[in-house]
């Protein structure tokens, strides 16, 4: 499948740009109000007690601000943050090297934490509970365990698949937060703030149009903003008006609902099944896509907006999908 403009993963060329647009203060972070409120209370209490924060877990679809909010937490706690991802921690020694380099109250952010191996989790448990690292040297009867004390730290885990976390690991997080999709008004505000940082003039209705097509996700909103800005530059326009915005978004293949070819192909597959559940493996084979991408990238927004139902037997298109695609259900078809 070709690269999607609404892909939820960070593209390689976007990393530095995303950092430059990342909010650094609570007042700059738009949305997730309930999470922000709870975190502000926890941070205030931890600072008054002069303690590290409880370990916390952020889960939800990609691109909703898990990393950004973790950076703000570190700044509010006036401490350092170490960023890594579970696939990078292959051996217990990798984790030990990270943990032993942390200072008191530092934050360790592990992305894709559901991908930690059971062996790594076993090393992590005493570190989370007792701030202690148990290192096994040797093997067999001669094996010895060396205990290394660690400074109090905060582990922030981020995952798109909370259901894949082992129960022992999940239970060790003192706080757990589900990241929600953003409203169009929140996304429009994010877009306008980003446009200011990019020194780009943008019309209100243009920001609203981009927001409407951003699938409730800031990462996609910022990507679309930058692509529309490219179209404006080519058109020799210093202003992103509605005409340029509509032309750009249509050329990018993102419709009024934020759907692209992959979304429509997915929904068509379900709708044409005429109420019969379609298994994930069948969908993946038909779309030539891996199951994880379908579950983590394509389905969450469609599911949240009522375009499909998940059952034990598979996925089923809803009447909303049939209406969108103008594919009648068997019940609505007549013999004449």
From Swiss-Prot:
Keywords: ATP-binding, Cytoplasm, DNA damage, DNA recombination, DNA repair, DNA-binding, Hydrolase, Nucleotide-binding
Gene Ontology biological process terms, A to Z: DNA recombination; DNA repair
Region called Large ATPase domain (RuvB-L), residue ranges: 1-182
Residue segments, region Small ATPAse domain (RuvB-S): 183-253
Presence of keyword ATP-binding: yes
Binding site for DNA: 310, 315
Entry's localization field: Cytoplasm
Annotated Gene Ontology cellular component terms: cytoplasm; Holliday junction resolvase complex
Keyword Glycoprotein part of the UniProt annotation: no
InterPro entries: AAA+_ATPase, AAA_lid_4, DNA_helicase_Holl-junc_RuvB, P-loop_NTPase, RuvB-like_N, RuvB_C, WH-like_DNA-bd_sf, WH_DNA-bd_sf
Binding site for Mg(2+): 67
Residues annotated for ATP binding in this entry: 21-22, 63, 66-68, 129-131, 172, 182, 219
Role description: The RuvA-RuvB-RuvC complex processes Holliday junction (HJ) DNA during genetic recombination and DNA repair, while the RuvA-RuvB complex plays an important role in the rescue of blocked DNA replication forks via replication fork reversal (RFR). RuvA specifically binds to HJ cruciform DNA, conferring on it an open structure. The RuvB hexamer acts as an ATP-dependent pump, pulling dsDNA into and through the RuvAB complex. RuvB forms 2 homohexamers on either side of HJ DNA bound by 1 or 2 RuvA tetramers; 4 subunits per hexamer contact DNA at a time.
Descriptive protein name: Holliday junction branch migration complex subunit RuvB
